[in-house]
């Protein structure tokens, strides 16, 4: 008898409409993605970048720790020795299709040369566009330097 009365008075529909009205006046949770962007954590791991010192010299000392620790073997480094005895990279390639964005390369780097920046919009139509060479990585570092420096500063006490 109770089920008959519930179905007669459309109890389920009224209950559903009440639930809809309850959430109708609350603030939105979703965002309009291409036009609005959600805040990104300081520990977010996005597009890779190579950093430079303030004088413009690249930070990478060609120790190859990032290449050795990369579980996906996405990093390839070739280096030569300079006239002053220091080593610098001649080739620094990252295959972004292999990268699993674990951040181990960033953690292994003793001079904070390779970092994962805040950019997450780097889709491409071709595979070759996702193989980053040294120049592209340095351009990313130059473009995101202020964001990268503040990100590293915020995370410094936890490293």
From Swiss-Prot:
Protein name stated in the entry: NADH-quinone oxidoreductase subunit I
GO molecular function: 4 iron, 4 sulfur cluster binding; iron ion binding; NADH:ubiquinone reductase (non-electrogenic) activity; quinone binding
Organism: Rickettsia felis (strain ATCC VR-1525 / URRWXCal2)
Its biological purpose: NDH-1 shuttles electrons from NADH, via FMN and iron-sulfur (Fe-S) centers, to quinones in the respiratory chain. The immediate electron acceptor for the enzyme in this species is believed to be ubiquinone. Couples the redox reaction to proton translocation (for every two electrons transferred, four hydrogen ions are translocated across the cytoplasmic membrane), and thus conserves the redox energy in a proton gradient.
Ligand binding ([4Fe-4S] cluster 1): 60, 63, 66, 109
Gene: nuoI
Main location, first listed in the record: membrane
GO CC terms of this entry: plasma membrane
Keywords tagged on the record: 4Fe-4S, Cell inner membrane, Cell membrane, Iron, Iron-sulfur, Membrane, Metal-binding, NAD, Quinone, Repeat, Translocase, Ubiquinone
Catalytic activity: a quinone + NADH + 5 H(+)(in) = a quinol + NAD(+) + 4 H(+)(out)
InterPro entries: 4Fe4S_Fe-S-bd, 4Fe4S_Fe_S_CS, NADH_quinone_OxRdtase_chainI
GO BP terms: aerobic respiration
Lineage top rank: taxon: Bacteria
Family matches, as Pfam families: Fer4_7 (PF12838)
Annotated residues for binding of [4Fe-4S] cluster 2: 70, 99, 102, 105
Entry note: cofactor: Binds 2 [4Fe-4S] clusters per subunit.
Limits of the 4Fe-4S ferredoxin-type domain: 51-80, 90-119
Entry EC number(s): 7.1.1.-
Quaternary assembly: NDH-1 is composed of 14 different subunits. Subunits NuoA, H, J, K, L, M, N constitute the membrane sector of the complex.
Family: Belongs to the complex I 23 kDa subunit family.
Membrane topology: Peripheral membrane protein
Cofactor: [4Fe-4S] cluster
Places the protein is found: Cell inner membrane
């Amino acid at each position: 008898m109770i089920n008959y009365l519930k179905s007669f008075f459309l109890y389920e529909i009224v209950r559903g409409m009440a639930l809809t009205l309850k959430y109708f006046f609350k603030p939105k949770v979703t965002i309009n993605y291409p036009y609005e962007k959600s805040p990104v954590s300081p520990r977010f791991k996005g597009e890779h970048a190579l950093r430079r010192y303030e004088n413009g010299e690249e930070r990478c000392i060609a120790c190859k720790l990032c290449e050795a620790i990369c579980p996906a073997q996405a990093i390839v480094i070739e280096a030569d020795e300079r006239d002053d005895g220091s080593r610098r990279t001649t080739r620094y390639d990252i295959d972004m299709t292999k990268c699993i964005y674990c951040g181990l390369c960033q953690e292994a780097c003793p001079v904070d040369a390779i970092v994962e920046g805040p950019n997450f919009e780097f889709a491409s139509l071709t595979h070759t566009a996702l193989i980053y060479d040294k120049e592209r990585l340095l351009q990313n570092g130059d473009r995101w330097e202020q964001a990268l420096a503040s990100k590293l500063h915020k995370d410094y006490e936890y490293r």
